[in-house]
Amino acid sequence: MPRASEIKKGEVVDLNGQLLIVKDIEVHSPSARGAATLYKMRFSNVRTGLKYEESFKGDDMLSTTQLERRQVAFSYIDGDDYVFMDNEDFSQYMLKKNDIEDQLLFLTEEIQGLQVLMVDGQVLALELPQTVEMEVIETTPAMKAASASARTKPAKFVTGLTIQVPEYLEQGERVKIHTAEKRFMGRAD
């Protein structure tokens, strides 16, 4: 059983008989001497989808459950359901729009590296790759004398995502975006 300080985002924890997927972790280090570092974790219940929040000391022991990860490709949308197809056995997995709302900003037809997280054959969540490539569909025109300095401008993508990009980029260019931080990484190869 791992300590609370060893738990990472995306892991499944068994807490009070409920399977909870770790959505976010905040670390608080109190300034008082002898005070333990606190780990405030936000969970989502695997079965019900309800949100839950709990704080742990760094040396608290937590029970984790092994996840099965399956490589998938985005297939189609059916009402509020997003359908993904397994890359190996072509079985289909459905996820509700509410469950993957954060990931929808990066979900395009050509996205590669998607995984579904499963426990006991039940789909829990969708995991995005660390970076995705997307095409800029709307941004202000590049300035003639724009240098590769730190000046930025907003750029909009087909999914509705808007991030800051260097001002030398133009509409139609493909860029790499860090999915967790929603930030520009560089031009796509």
From Swiss-Prot:
Q: Which GO terms describe its biological process?
A: peptide biosynthetic process
Q: List the disulfide bonds.
A: none
Q: Could you tell me one molecular function GO term of this UniProt entry?
A: translation elongation factor activity
Annotated Gene3D superfamilies: 2.30.30.30, Nucleic acid-binding proteins
Taxonomic placement? Bacteria, Pseudomonadati, Pseudomonadota, Gammaproteobacteria, Oceanospirillales
Any one GO CC term of the record: cytoplasm
Similarity section: Belongs to the elongation factor P family.
Report which superkingdom the organism of origin falls in.
Bacteria
Q: This chain belongs to which protein, by name?
A: Elongation factor P-like protein
Q: Which InterPro entries match?
A: Elong-fact-P_C, NA-bd_OB-fold, Rib_uL2_dom2, Transl_elong_fac_P/YeiP, Transl_elong_KOW-like, Transl_elong_p-like_YeiP, Transl_elong_P/YeiP_cen, Transl_elong_P/YeiP_CS
Matching SUPFAM superfamilies: Nucleic acid-binding proteins, Translation proteins SH3-like domain
